[in-house]
Amino acid sequence: MNPLTIFCLVAVLLSAATAHRGSNAIRNNLQPSGXLSPRELEDMPAINEITFEKLQEMPAEEAADLVNKIYHLSQMSRNIEPSYAPSPNQIPAYTYTPTGQRVNFNLNQLVATAQQQPNFGKQEVTVFITGLPNKSSAMLTANQKLVQAYLQAYNGRVQVQGEQGDDSNQDTSSSEESSNRPNGQQPKPNGNLVVIDLGAVIRNFEDLVLLDINRVGAAIGNSLVQLTAQADVPQEVINIVAQGIAAHVAGAAARQYTRQTGNTLRRITAMDPSKIYARKPNTLVGLARGNADFVDAIHTSAYGLGTTTRAGDVDFYPNGPSVNMPGTDDIIEASLRATRYLAETVLPGNDRNFPAVAAESLQQYKNNNGNGRRAYMGIAADYDLEGDYILQVNAKSPFGKSAPAQKQNSYHGIHQGAGRPN
């Protein structure tokens, strides 16, 4: 039976619940608490009628309720299997030369493209896997900010050639644009950025729901294996940053890399990892600690498009588990704030803009009852961090509070090398 047919049948026969969200606490994991009325089930749109544009137009709480109802129905049925898996020659990707020129290719051409770039992989390689399409200014801006941040960090550049967007209506500041603008000769590049634009082939919410995470992740993992074998890029310099559903794809890619090589990738950073709606029976799926040497996650729409489920060695919850973030009006923009926050930390001098402390809720953070040591969300996160961390953020850029974290009741551990590997 078609997965969508099963999904609709489940919606008629079963009832589910929306999540408790009032407590703003991590332990509250979207558990069912009541029943949907027959009228509510009847009024629910078909999955193929839901678009990212509609989710953006809806009030955040309303959109979150809809997404959570769909998620619970999918979990109760246990019959929704993934069926959408774009092939490597359908997934667009791009990288940049040291002068900022964009080089376009498809995923199946990654190795050939890398081999044409001088000194590719001699230093750090960051693979950015997008998880949402560039269908709005918020989506476009978030991705551009992250790309520009890495190019500034690696190549000393701010503006991506040929990609200047109109950000006149977007919140931005010098914290997202380094003050160290290039003067004269470009510095020698100290890293490479590869963007795997999976979001470009996630055309609608249905594609996201039915994405075959393990199959797509295995394809990306195989490409990374080839990058090591044929382009001499060692695993210890490969970091993945991934957005939404792509965070789980990154986990699958890293597991495939380990299966094929016996080695683990250095780091995976998840930017608001999403819920997982479809899965094959008796099959593990999703990002988890152990997929890389270090896995960190930033949750900015935990009760909306994202998930409260822990995804890494350390999970950061700005303003506590929430539907949205300060300064956002919808769950799409809230989810993308994780990308904006990471971008802010990538730029030189901003890596400690987001101090956090171990806590279970924003209230506990405010009451200074968090346990454990202080930490920094983003690129400077210590690789030995574990647990859940809470912090406060600003509504506009610069988003990081920048002030030192409050002194906690207990402090333990010694910093063992923060941020990117040497």
UniProtKB/Swiss-Prot annotation:
Q: Name one GO biological process term.
A: lipid catabolic process
* Top-level taxon of the source organism: Eukaryota
Disulphide bridges, residue numbers:
none
User: Compositional bias (Polar residues) at which positions?
Assistant: 180-189
Q: In which tissues is it expressed?
A: Synthesized in the fat body and ovarian follicle cells and accumulate in the oocyte.
Compartments where found: Secreted
Of the GO CC terms on this record, one is: extracellular space
Keywords assigned by UniProt, alphabetized: Secreted, Signal
Region annotation (Disordered) maps to 161-191, 399-422
InterPro entries, alphabetized:
AB_hydrolase_fold (IPR029058), Lipase (IPR013818), TAG_lipase (IPR000734)
**Secretion signal span:** 1-20
Q: Which GO terms describe its molecular function?
A: lipase activity; serine hydrolase activity
State what induces this protein: By beta-ecdysone; in males.
Gene3D superfamilies, per database record? alpha/beta hydrolase (3.40.50.1820)
- Name one matching Pfam family: Lipase
Q: What does this protein do?
A: Vitellogenin is the major yolk protein of eggs where it is used as a food source during embryogenesis.
By sequence similarity, the record places it as follows: Belongs to the AB hydrolase superfamily. Lipase family.
State the name under which the record lists this protein.
Vitellogenin-2
